[in-house]
């Protein structure tokens, strides 16, 4: 009976090592790609978040227009980065000899989603986004963002050999 438990643990561990990166990649890509429709079409929810909440907040700090259309952090710019990160993650997951691409996608995804989490926590946007019509998402966007952050961090941990090798090459270049 003990051997069966050990065998099951070993097979689960083996499955996670072989396929876990796919689960994480598909989750991140799903969250990022499904949000593109909202970001690229100027949906009322997206307009409210970027132009109704974040841009006035940034303007109060002297950075007017950064979240408005054409701004450096506009919905379309953020969506473009999410699309690129998703594509890099998917290509890197599908092609074993291109795992470095997955690392770049995970790092890019982690950076983008860290910004989203920051703006949920430290701006008037809030954890539970209350739309202009008074409806609330109940924290769904924030929870999805946290899931993406964890997934990207786990992917970077799973592929740590790649970026640690890069770091080693960079730090020993001048030695």
Language-model regions, residue ranges each:
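Membrane-interface extramembranous regions
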Residues: 2-175
